[in-house]
Amino acid sequence: MNHLKLGAAELDRMPAIPDAQMTAEQKKVMDEIAAGPRGRIGGPFIPLMRSPELMNRLQKVGEYLRFQNTVGLRNSEFAVLIVARQWSQPIEWAIHRPIAEKEGVLPATCDAIAEGRRPDNMTDDETLIYNVLEELRNNRSLSDTTYGQLHKRFGEQGVIDLVAHY
């Protein structure tokens, strides 16, 4: 089974390992990831193939953060877009924008984030998440006020689930 979506990764320092050259451990982890909610291997998993145990552990964290977190898929995808823009990560942006829009984030909101502008007409959750992530980026911490708003809306576990994305 070819697990990989090839493209720009072919030009990387650590390109995808062809199936025929994978170790048994690499194949096992690749099969597990491909059978999960992602359905394929791409992005950061390409270089991580060189350390299958680390890749497996990280993908489980990522699977939780993406598919099982307590803030909801729409909110977590919105957060991913903000962070992808803050850190100039076009691959993450390309992967997650369609998911965010499918989950209900407006295209105009995505466009504003892509252009580095604060979106107009955000939902209450989007406004809170945007403020949290901007404050973290700018101050490397949250004020008591912002933390209190985040905690009130999502609880302790939600605070951790959201900030862990960052």
Residue ranges and their predicted role:
Residues 1-71:
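Mobile cap/lid helix-loop segments that border enzyme active or cofactor-binding sites
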Residues 23, 155-156:
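Transmembrane-helix boundary/entry motifs in multi-pass membrane transporters
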Residues 39, 56-61, 77, 93-95, ...:
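A generic alpha-helix surface/boundary motif
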Residues 44-48, 58-65, 78-84, 113-114, ...:
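Short alpha-helical scaffolding segments that buttress acidic/His motifs in well-ordered protein cores
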Residues 54-57, 71, 75-103, 107:
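Conserved alpha-helical segments that form or flank metal/cofactor-binding pockets of metalloenzymes
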Residues 97-123:
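Histidine/lysine/aspartate-rich catalytic loop segments that bind and position anionic ligands
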Residues 119-147, 151:
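Strongly charged, low-complexity linkers/loops
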